[in-house]
Amino acid sequence: MRVEEFLKQKGIEVGDYVRIIKVEDGEKVEYEGIVMPPYELSEGDTVVIKLDNGYNIGIAIEKIQEINVIEKAKAKPEVHFKAELEPRKELPTITILGTGGTIASRIDYETGAVYPAFTAEELAKAVPEIFEIANIKPKLLFNIFSEDMKPKHWIEIAHETAKALNSGNEGVVIAHGTDTMGYTAAALSFMLRNLTKPVVLVGAQRSSDRPSSDAAMNLICATRMAVSDAAEVMVVMHGETSDTYCLAHRGTKVRKMHTSRRDAFRSINDIPIAKIWSDGKIEFLRDDYRKRSEGEVWVDDKLEEKVALVKVYPGMSAELIDFLVDKGYKGIVIEGTGLGHTPSDLIPSIKRAVDEGVAVCMTSQCLYGRVNLNVYATGRKLLKAGVIPCEDMLPETAYVKLMWVLGHTNDLREAKKMMLTNYAGEITPYTKPNTFLI
């Protein structure tokens, strides 16, 4: 029996507060919570309720011995806040751009449902603390999961960001899903030229309906960083699992390193720019960050989308490289093993790619450390084949950078020169011991 039919027979509607008695291994277990809408991808035979602690559980219909309504759902029209507050002259003004993701979610407490369509306006209204930091101009660009983000979205975000910065805003906060936030941060780092004010990407590992949500604190800290002196593209997220402080990471050196921890984001081969406390304290951890200044920000949005990111693995077939070349790809970023190696039998296909005008770049799947193709014979053969070693760049950053580079040149010598030029802090001069696993 499907859940819709089951609930209808029992006279139960989504949003009702119910008590369920379930039989598990001969024992009765009791749950109370709000009936949720059926999940789109569920089998349709499970009743989902939101417990009082905020978490959802699913109970198979066949295991439900008894289900009773404790309180009927209260019909209530949905409210959309516009966050139209009188500007305060003593506060700076920033723009919050909404793009989607976990931070852009809200709970309807009458039905228990969690909606991903939490607009930037509603998000701002839900965290009133940010109005004590700055005047907020919220704007929803789109509402998509970050895994659906494409280069065209990066370009739109870049233009909207530059527009906001050039129209009197002191900074921009971008609400973004966490899964591909590093890619977007890197793309903005290369596309936003002459950056004179802060651009801060922020997200949440846990949605706003969960007791352990990091959404509010992350947004508060991001807003504080957006009115700071650091004129860089940054990612601001929790610095540790508790609600102690957030960290501001440089946009080209940051990576999501855990699927679910609140402090999942880490600076790789670099130290963060700053620690931020929600009460307003900011501790800069380095002094070489780009400082706030005057001048117009402009967007360099030329991107070559026919670029691939390929991870090397034992037994990898050279046919994969050949396929990309045959399909007209202009660039390939390889995540090599160790210092930047591939199986030896890939080298002829890599050389063919370079000979046919494809830019082939090498990063390391170790993430930490630096590519060095001069140490072992395989690396030297790759160099001879024309592979560009990408120093200590993250694979994702190198992928985005190569798209940007090939948007400007088809000449492999010029492409190599540009890939090895440090435009946005993506390359550090040398590897510091204190940047490993921080």
From Swiss-Prot:
Keywords attached to this entry: ATP-binding, Ligase, Nucleotide-binding, Protein biosynthesis
PROSITE patterns for this protein: ASN_GLN_ASE_1, ASN_GLN_ASE_2, ASN_GLN_ASE_3
Catalytic activity: L-glutamyl-tRNA(Gln) + L-glutamine + ATP + H2O = L-glutaminyl-tRNA(Gln) + L-glutamate + ADP + phosphate + H(+)
Keyword Protein biosynthesis belongs to the record: yes
SUPFAM superfamilies linked: GatD N-terminal domain-like (SSF141300), Glutaminase/Asparaginase (SSF53774)
Xref: CDD domains: GatD (cd08962)
Asparaginase/glutaminase domain mapped to chain residues: 92-422
Molecular function GO labels: asparaginase activity; ATP binding; glutaminyl-tRNA synthase (glutamine-hydrolyzing) activity
Residues at the active site: 102, 178-179, 256
Cystine bridges: none
EC numbers on record: 6.3.5.-
GO biological process: amino acid metabolic process; regulation of translational fidelity; translation
Ligase keyword on record: yes
Top-rank EC class of the record's enzyme: ligase
NCBIfam families: asnASE_I, gatD_arch, PRK04183.1
Family from the record: Belongs to the asparaginase 1 family. GatD subfamily.
PANTHER family in alphabetical order: 60 KDA LYSOPHOSPHOLIPASE (PTHR11707:SF28), L-ASPARAGINASE (PTHR11707)
Function: Allows the formation of correctly charged Gln-tRNA(Gln) through the transamidation of misacylated Glu-tRNA(Gln) in organisms which lack glutaminyl-tRNA synthetase. The reaction takes place in the presence of glutamine and ATP through an activated gamma-phospho-Glu-tRNA(Gln). The GatDE system is specific for glutamate and does not act on aspartate.
Assembly behavior: Heterodimer of GatD and GatE.
Name of protein: Glutamyl-tRNA(Gln) amidotransferase subunit D
Organism: Pyrococcus furiosus (strain ATCC 43587 / DSM 3638 / JCM 8422 / Vc1)
